[in-house]
Amino acid sequence: PAEADVILLNTCAVTANAVTDARQAVRRLQREAPGVPVVIAGCAAEVARKQLAALPGVLRVVEQDHKSRLLDAPPLVLFAEEAAGNVTPFPSSPAEAAARAATRDRTFPPFHIDGFRRARPVLKVQDGCSHGCAYCIVPLTRGPARSRPPKDCLAEMRRLLEAGYREIMISGINLRQYAMRDEGCRDFWDLLSYLDGELAPEWGSGARPDPARFRISSVEPAQLTERGIATLAETRMVCPHLHLSLQSGSADVLKAMRRGHYTPEALLSAVEGVAKLWPRFGLGADILMGFPGETEAHVLETLEVVRSLPLTYAHVFPYSARPGTVAAELPDQVEKAVRQERAARVRAVVEAKREAFWKDTLTCERLLVALDCNEDAGAASGQHGVDECYVPCRLRTPLRGEGHTLIPVRPVSLSRKGVIVEPVRP
């Protein structure tokens, strides 16, 4: 950091702790690189702009709507003193921040990626969210839902494939709200079908010696409709892996969260349909325990859903109140120790499912692993990556010159961190 002209700090604000972490990061950078100006972007820049701007060494706090200008050249033009006069005043209240978010630009910002340091680049096709879950600050920090034009998505996908990448993550803040109807895509499933139809003949399995694949970052349970599952069945390049924004297995809690657009029963039925499509598939979920008003009966409902789902992993969080959200003002807040205990109970069930799936992976004759050849990993630790079902894998013996490609391997043993594999040679 000390050799930099300017340090750009991209921040998160999904929890109150994330904003605290951003402030601590600025202070740490000032110790490590005294005198180097810091420019702050990201979600914390939207909800905690005033506090961050007051920190010593901070040259500029860039709003989300202006973030794309960071790509301009020369970048230091953005940080000139006279530009400060164009910054929107700080919102004086959460209500004002919400009103501002509702009027923000709905155009997807122009940018593209030609290269990526890791093995699995991210293709961002959607940003923002217009739903408004009770616990979530994202609509304020990221603004309303915005979708990337399909042809733009395809062009970037081609650039990444031609650069040698063989697994690409299709990502968005809320893929359920993807829509470009004027360009032939009613929803995310239309986009996925379009990308697969255009690329599979050249890049799909069987089309070339080094095929490529897509991975979907996360889907809303309500997206798993009959048409959605049918689209997955028709694609040739999508990994057999889904990550669900589940949040709770209780219908009552989902309604309190303002997530009543799906029910646990409908989700279980949809996942049964996915299981018929993919005999072996990875299934992850985000689960939030201890939401205000959650009772022991609700916890038992969630545990029953978790036991019923063929989960292979899950991110289980104890709820934490986020200032500026509806949930932070709700009555019947659950004590911190109880929240943590409930999350631990769910994690224990998920952990058993994860271990069982890893053991089952040992019965597979062949896996295709996207290796992460990041220089920071170091050859001494062995290269690591994920298989098509998102099982973490590590090569028993490191390979050289295999970055970004899909490596055929066979599983040989288990470790605490995943499956140990070795290459399958032709």
What role is predicted for each listed range?
Residues A13, R142-G143, D182-C185, K255-Y262, ...:
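Short glycine-enriched, charge-decorated loop/helix-capping segments at active-site entrances
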Residues V38-V39, V47-A48, E162-V299, R307:
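Conserved SAM/AdoMet-binding glycine-rich loop
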Residues P1-Y178, S193, L242, T263-K276, ...:
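Proteins enriched for Cys/Gly/acidic motifs involved in redox and nucleic-acid/cofactor modification
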Residues V62, E329-P426:
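Terminal RNA-binding accessory module
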Residues G172, S218-E220, L246-S248, A285-M289, ...:
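Active-site proximal loops enriched in glycine and acidic residues that flank catalytic Cys/His/Asp
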Residues L8, C43, L70, I170, ...:
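Residue-level signal for inorganic ion chemistry
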Residues V77-D105, D114, G184-C185, G197-A212, ...:
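Intrinsically disordered, low-complexity coil segments
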Residues F116-A119, C129-H131, V238, S248, ...:
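Short flexible coil/turn linkers enriched for glycine and charged/polar residues
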